[in-house]
C-alpha cells in the first residue's frame, strides 16, 4: 500500500505582529516573476513557521473554526473517495495513487501593510465538480510551479492568488498530492475560475523549470445566488519524469473586509517535504461536467505520449488520434512452422477499432494461412490504446500485448515494410490484399540488386498476367506498388528515359535469370537493366568452361557485386547479335627488311602470329557468347600474367603449353620489335571492328537495355583490364594495345548511346501530336535570320540551305519512320561529299561538313529556345540523334575513303596522353593535300558558294584548331569586307 505525503505550508506571522514575514509570504504585485530568474528555495525552519499547520486528511475533511470575515473553504477533491480520519501528521494509506487539487481563496481586500495569516480551521469542505486534467510535474531535485487564480467577489474587484516557486527537494515519500482549497463567503455569488490548457509532458534535466498556470476569472450566466461555479484551467504545464504523489496545500486567509482597491496576494517559496522520486501512475478519474473528447488521461509510468498534446478545454477534438507512440521494443516470435516464417520484428501500435489489424514492420514474411482463434495473432507486437494486436487476420480490439483479442488468420499474409495484407473477406482502404501465391510469385521471379532498374509499368503488366493465369482479382497499380515495396525492402523509384518519354522505374529490382518472364520481356523489348557497376576487386567468372578455367562463381565472390554476366541468357540475346560473322584473315607480318632482335628466330615470329591469331579467335568466341569477363582472362593468359606474379597460383597447363610454344622472354623481345608492333596494331583494328559489327550490327535496330548496359559496362572496363593483364610487358606494345582498345571502347559507348537515342526518337516520330507541334514551331523559325548569322561562319549557299529546310519540313510532315529519316541523312552526306569522292581532300571536307552541320543545327535550336517553343524537348532529342548519326556516317565515309576500318580511323587520335606519336600522323600529308586541292574546294555546291569571295582563301576551310597554329587572324581580317 503506497503511503501519502503531506506538504507543509509555512505559516505567516499573525496580523498583530509587524510585517516581518519571509519573502515568500509578503504581498507582491500581480505580475508573475520572469522564468529566467527563479527564486532560490527556502528551507523550512521553526523560526519561519511558529505555528505550523498540517493538513491531516482531505478525503474526509473535519470541521474547522470559521475564519474571520465569514470565510468559507471549498475543498475540491478529484477522486472523491472518502477515507477515515487519521492522526495529525501520520501518513494516510491509499488504495491507489491519487491526485488532489485543493484551493483556499479568501475574498475581500487587504491593506498593503497587512500580512497573510493562517486560516483557522473549522470551515466545512464541500465537494464541487471541477473540470480538470491530471498533470504530473516532477524534476530530479527541484520544481517550480506558478499558479495564478483570481476570485471575483464583486463586479470590478478581483483578488488574484499567485503561487510561485514551489521547490520540491528530493526526499522519500511514495505519494504526492496537490491540494488547492478555495473559500468564499456563501452570501456572495463570487466565481472562481481555474482553467487547464496545453498540458505537456517532457523529459528535462534536474534543474529549475518555470511552469506558469494563469487563470482568468469569468462569470457564469445564470448562476444562482449563493453558489460558486468554478472552472479550472491550467496553462502550459510541463511534466517531467514522474515521481511519487505529493500533496500541496495553499491557504489564504482574508482580513476584515475594508473598502479600498483590491490588493494582489502572492505566496512564494512553498516547500513541500517528504517527496520521493518514484514512478507514479495517474489514475483516470471521472470528473463531472467534463466531456471525454476534451479530456485525455495519460496512463502508465513510461515516458511515451500521444502524437498530440492533451486537448484544450476550449477546443473540441471529437476524433481520437490515429497513431500512438510506443516504446521501441523488439518482439521475437515463437518458433515458426512449415507455414509460418518468424523473424525479429518491431511492431508499431495503431489506434483502431473492431478488427482493424496493426502494422508490422521489419520481418521478411510473417504468415499464417491456417491459424485461427485468439492465438492466431501472435505475429504482431503489443496492441496500443484503442485496439488490440493484429495478427494473421487481424486481432480483435480487446486484446493487448503480443496477441490480438481473437480474429481469424485464414488465407492472409503479413508482409514486411509496414503493410498488413488481409484476407479476401476483409476490405481496408489503407492496406493491400494479396494472396500467398502472388507473394511467392514475386519472390520466384524478381530479385534485388544494385545498379539495376525495372519499369514500373512492366512489372504491373506481369502481375496482371499472373492474376489472369491464377484467376485472381488484381489490385490497382497503387496497391500493387505498396505490395512491391513490402516484399522487396529498400526499393527506390526513379524516372528514367528521355525528355517527354520518361517512365518510372523501380531502382534496385530485376528479373531473375531463371524466370520465364525474360522471354516475355524479349517480346516486349522492355528489358530490365541487369548490368551492374563494375568492381575490379570482385568480378564474376564465366559460366561456360574455357581451357584452363573453371565453371561458375569463384569461392567467396558474390554475384551481385561484380560485372554483369548475361551469358546465361545468351539464347535470348543472340538474335540481336550477328553471330555468323567470322574473324577476317590477318595480313602477313612484314619485317620491312629489319634484322630480328638477338635471340629471336623466324620460327618465333611464326609462333607469335599463330598464337595471336588463336588468341583473337578466342576473344571472338567469348564475345559471341556474351562472356565479357573472359576477355580479361584471355589477355592474362596470352601475356603470361601469372608468370610475372610470384604470389599467384602455379601456372596452369595452358600456360605451360604456351610457354613451350613461345617463351615469355621471346614475347618480351618481340613486343619491342617495330614490325611486330605495326602488325599487332593492324590485327587489333580488324578484331575490334569485327567485334563492333557482331555486338551492334545495326545502330538503329532496337537492342534490349540489358544487353546495352552490359556492353557499356564492358567498354568501361576494357582499358583497365588490359593494363592490368600486360604487367611487365614493354611500354611500346602496351601503348599500341591500349590505343586500339580505347578506340574500341569509345566506339561501343557511342554506338550504344546512338541506339538509345534512336529508340527514344522513334517514339517521338511516331507521335502525331508531337509531330504537328514540331512542324508548327518550325514554321515560326526565321530561317532567313538563321542563315544570315550562320553564313558568316559556314558560308553555305542559300539555295542549299533552303532545299535542306524544305526537305526537312516535308519529311517531318509525312511522319516518316526513323529508317526513312536515316536514309534522308545519308543522302545529304552523299550529296555534300560527292565532289570530293576519290580525292585526297575527302577526309578534310567530311570533317568540315560535320562542323558546319552541328553549328547550323545549334542556331536553329537557339531560335526555338528563344521563342519558348512547346516542342523544344522533341527538337532537342531529334537534334542529338541527327548529329550523332551524322557523326556515324562521316566516320564510315572517311574510313572507306582511306581504306581502313572505322576503329583504325578513330584510333589515330586515341590515347593522346600516353601516345608518343604526333597528334595527327597524317598532318604533313594533309597539308600537302590541302595545297593540291586548292582549286577543288570552291566547286562544292553545298559547302561554299564557289568563287563568290575571292578574298576568302581555301585556308578558311581548315578547322579552327589548325588555323590557330598558322594564322589566327586570317579568317577574321579577310572576312571583314564581305561581312
Swiss-Prot record:
GO biological process, one term: regulation of transcription by RNA polymerase II
Membrane-crossing residue ranges in chain numbering: none
GO molecular function terms attached to this record: DNA-binding transcription factor activity, RNA polymerase II-specific; RNA polymerase II cis-regulatory region sequence-specific DNA binding; sequence-specific double-stranded DNA binding
Region annotated Disordered, chain positions: 1-136, 181-227, 370-405, 915-960
Residue ranges with Gly residues bias: 380-405
InterPro entries per UniProt: DNA-bd_RFX, RFX-like, RFX1_trans_act, WH-like_DNA-bd_sf, WH_DNA-bd_sf
Domain of life, source organism: Eukaryota
Low complexity compositional bias, start-end: 45-73, 127-136, 370-379
Ranges annotated as biased composition (Polar residues): 114-126, 190-203, 209-220
Subcellular location: Nucleus
Stretches for region Necessary for dimerization: 744-979
Keyword Nucleus attributed: yes
Swiss-Prot/TrEMBL keywords: Activator, DNA-binding, Nucleus, Phosphoprotein, Transcription, Transcription regulation
GO cellular component entries: chromatin; intracellular membrane-bounded organelle; nucleoplasm
Residue ranges: DNA binding: 438-513
Positions of modified residues (Phosphoserine): 60, 978-979
Pfam families recorded: BCD_RFX, RFX1_trans_act, RFX_DNA_binding
Quaternary data: Homodimer; binds DNA as a homodimer. Heterodimer; heterodimerizes with RFX2 and RFX3.
Family of this protein: Belongs to the RFX family.
Function: Regulatory factor essential for MHC class II genes expression. Binds to the X boxes of MHC class II genes. Also binds to an inverted repeat (ENH1) required for hepatitis B virus genes expression and to the most upstream element (alpha) of the RPL30 promoter.
Protein name: MHC class II regulatory factor RFX1
Amino acid at each position: 500500500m503506497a503511503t501519502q505525503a503531506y506538504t507543509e505550508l509555512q505559516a505567516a506571522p499573525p496580523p498583530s505582529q509587524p510585517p516581518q514575514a519571509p519573502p515568500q509570504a509578503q504581498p507582491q504585485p500581480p505580475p508573475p516573476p520572469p522564468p529566467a530568474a527563479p527564486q532560490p528555495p527556502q528551507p523550512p525552519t521553526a523560526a519561519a513557521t511558529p505555528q505550523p499547520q498540517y493538513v491531516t486528511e482531505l478525503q474526509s475533511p473535519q470541521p474547522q473554526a470559521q475564519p474571520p470575515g465569514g470565510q468559507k473553504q471549498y475543498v475540491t477533491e478529484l477522486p472523491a473517495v472518502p477515507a477515515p480520519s487519521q492522526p495529525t501528521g501520520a501518513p494516510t494509506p491509499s488504495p491507489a495513487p491519487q491526485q488532489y487539487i485543493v484551493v483556499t481563496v479568501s475574498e475581500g481586500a487587504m491593506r498593503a501593510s497587512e500580512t497573510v495569516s493562517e486560516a483557522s480551521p473549522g470551515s466545512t469542505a464541500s465537494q464541487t465538480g471541477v473540470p480538470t486534467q491530471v498533470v504530473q510535474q516532477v524534476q530530479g531535485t527541484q520544481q517550480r510551479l506558478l499558479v495564478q487564480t483570481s476570485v471575483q467577489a464583486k463586479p470590478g474587484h478581483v483578488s488574484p492568488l499567485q503561487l510561485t516557486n514551489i521547490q520540491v527537494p528530493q526526499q522519500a515519500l511514495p505519494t504526492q498530492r496537490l491540494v488547492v482549497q478555495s473559500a468564499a463567503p456563501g452570501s456572495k455569488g463570487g466565481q472562481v475560475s481555474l482553467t487547464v490548457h496545453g498540458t505537456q509532458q517532457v523529459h528535462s534535466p534536474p534543474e529549475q523549470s518555470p511552469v506558469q498556470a494563469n487563470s482568468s476569472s469569468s462569470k457564469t450566466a445564470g448562476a444562482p445566488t449563493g453558489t460558486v461555479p468554478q472552472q479550472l484551467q491550467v496553462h502550459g504545464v510541463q511534466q517531467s519524469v514522474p515521481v511519487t504523489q505529493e500533496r500541496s496545500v495553499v491557504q489564504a486567509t482574508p482580513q476584515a473586509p475594508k473598502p479600498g482597491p483590491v490588493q494582489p496576494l502572492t505566496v512564494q517559496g512553498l516547500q513541500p517535504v517528504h517527496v520521493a522520486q518514484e514512478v507514479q501512475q495517474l489514475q483516470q478519474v471521472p470528473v463531472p461536467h467534463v466531456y471525454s473528447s476534451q479530456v485525455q488521461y495519460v496512463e502508465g509510468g513510461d515516458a511515451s505520449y500521444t502524437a498530440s498534446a492533451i486537448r484544450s478545454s476550449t477546443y473540441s477534438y471529437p476524433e481520437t488520434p490515429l497513431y500512438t507512440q510506443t516504446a521501441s521494443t523488439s518482439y521475437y516470435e515463437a518458433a515458426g512452422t512449415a507455414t509460418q516464417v518468424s523473424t525479429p520484428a518491431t511492431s508499431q501500435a495503431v489506434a483502431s477499432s473492431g478488427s482493424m489489424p496493426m502494422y508490422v514492420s521489419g520481418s521478411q514474411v510473417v504468415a499464417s494461412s491456417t491459424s485461427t482463434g485468439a492465438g492466431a495473432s501472435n505475429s504482431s507486437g503489443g496492441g496500443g490504446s484503442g485496439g488490440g494486436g493484429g495478427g494473421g487476420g487481424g486481432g480483435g480490439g480487446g486484446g493487448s500485448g503480443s496477441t490480438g483479442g481473437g480474429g481469424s488468420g485464414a488465407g492472409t499474409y503479413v508482409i514486411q515494410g509496414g503493410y498488413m495484407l488481409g484476407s479476401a473477406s476483409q476490405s481496408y482502404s489503407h492496406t493491400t490484399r494479396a494472396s500467398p501465391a502472388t507473394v511467392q510469385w514475386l519472390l520466384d521471379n524478381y530479385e534485388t540488386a544494385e545498379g539495376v532498374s525495372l519499369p514500373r509499368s512492366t512489372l504491373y503488366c506481369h502481375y496482371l498476367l499472373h492474376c489472369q493465369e491464377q484467376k485472381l482479382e488484381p489490385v490497382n497499380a497503387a496497391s500493387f506498388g505498396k505490395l512491391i515495396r513490402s516484399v522487396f525492402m529498400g526499393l527506390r523509384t526513379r524516372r528514367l528515359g528521355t525528355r517527354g518519354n520518361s517512365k518510372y522505374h523501380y531502382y534496385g529490382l530485376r528479373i531473375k535469370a531463371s524466370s520465364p518472364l525474360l522471354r516475355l520481356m524479349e517480346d516486349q523489348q522492355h528489358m530490365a537493366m541487369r548490368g551492374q557497376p563494375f568492381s575490379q576487386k570482385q568480378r564474376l567468372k564465366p559460366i561456360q568452361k574455357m581451357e584452363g578455367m573453371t565453371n561458375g562463381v569463384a569461392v567467396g565472390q558474390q554475384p551481385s557485386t561484380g560485372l554483369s554476366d548475361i551469358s546465361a541468357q545468351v539464347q535470348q540475346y543472340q538474335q540481336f547479335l550477328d553471330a555468323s560473322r567470322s574473324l577476317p584473315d590477318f595480313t602477313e607480318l612484314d619485317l620491312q627488311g629489319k634484322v630480328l632482335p638477338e635471340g629471336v628466330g623466324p620460327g618465333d615470329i611464326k609462333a607469335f602470329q599463330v598464337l595471336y591469331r588463336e588468341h583473337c579467335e578466342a576473344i571472338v568466341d567469348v564475345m559471341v557468347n556474351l562472356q565479357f569477363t573472359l576477355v580479361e582472362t584471355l589477355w592474362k593468359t596470352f601475356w603470361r600474367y601469372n608468370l610475372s606474379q610470384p604470389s599467384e597460383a602455379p601456372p596452369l597447363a595452358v600456360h605451360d603449353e604456351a610457354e613451350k610454344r613461345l617463351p615469355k622472354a621471346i614475347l618480351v623481345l618481340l613486343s619491342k620489335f617495330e614490325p611486330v608492333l605495326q602488325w599487332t596494331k593492324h590485327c587489333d583494328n580488324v578484331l575490334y571492328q569485327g567485334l563492333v559489327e557482331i555486338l551492334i550490327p545495326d545502330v538503329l535496330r532496337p537492342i534490349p537495355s540489358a544487353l546495352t548496359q552490359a556492353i557499356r559496362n564492358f567498354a568501361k572496363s576494357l582499358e583497365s583490364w588490359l593494363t592490368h593483364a600486360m604487367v611487365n610487358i614493354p611500354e611500346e606494345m602496351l601503348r599500341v594495345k591500349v590505343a586500339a582498345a580505347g578506340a574500341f571502347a569509345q566506339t561501343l559507348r557511342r554506338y550504344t548511346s546512338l541506339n538509345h537515342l534512336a529508340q527514344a526518337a522513334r517514339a517521338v516520330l511516331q507521335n502525331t501530336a508531337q509531330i504537328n507541334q514540331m512542324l508548327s514551331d518550325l514554321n515560326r523559325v526565321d530561317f532567313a535570320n538563321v542563315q544570315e548569322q550562320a553564313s558568316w561562319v559556314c558560308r553555305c549557299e542559300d539555295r542549299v540551305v533552303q532545299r535542306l529546310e524544305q526537305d526537312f519540313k516535308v519529311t517531318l510532315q509525312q511522319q516518316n519512320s526513323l529508317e526513312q529519316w536515316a536514309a534522308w541523312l545519308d543522302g545529304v552526306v552523299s550529296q555534300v561529299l560527292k565532289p570530293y569522292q576519290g580525292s585526297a581532300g575527302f577526309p578534310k571536307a567530311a570533317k568540315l561538313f560535320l562542323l558546319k552541320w552541328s553549328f547550323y543545327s545549334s542556331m536553329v535550336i537557339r531560335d526555338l529556345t528563344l521563342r519558348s517553343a512547346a516542342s523544344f524537348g522533341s527538337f532537342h532529342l531529334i537534334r542529338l540523334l541527327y548529329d550523332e548519326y551524322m557523326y556515324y556516317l562521316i566516320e564510315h565515309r572517311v574510313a572507306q575513303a582511306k581504306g581502313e576500318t572505322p576503329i583504325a580511323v578513330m584510333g589515330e587520335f586515341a590515347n593522346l596522353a600516353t601516345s608518343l606519336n604526333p597528334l595527327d600522323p597524317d598532318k604533313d600529308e594533309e597539308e600537302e593535300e590541302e595545297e593540291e586541292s586548292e582549286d577543288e574546294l570552291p566547286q562544292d555546291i553545298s559547302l561554299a558558294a564557289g568563287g563568290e569571295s575571292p578574298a576568302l582563301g581555301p585556308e578558311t576551310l581548315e578547322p579552327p584548331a589548325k588555323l590557330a597554329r598558322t594564322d589566327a587572324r586570317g579568317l577574321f581580317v579577310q572576312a571583314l569586307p564581305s561581312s
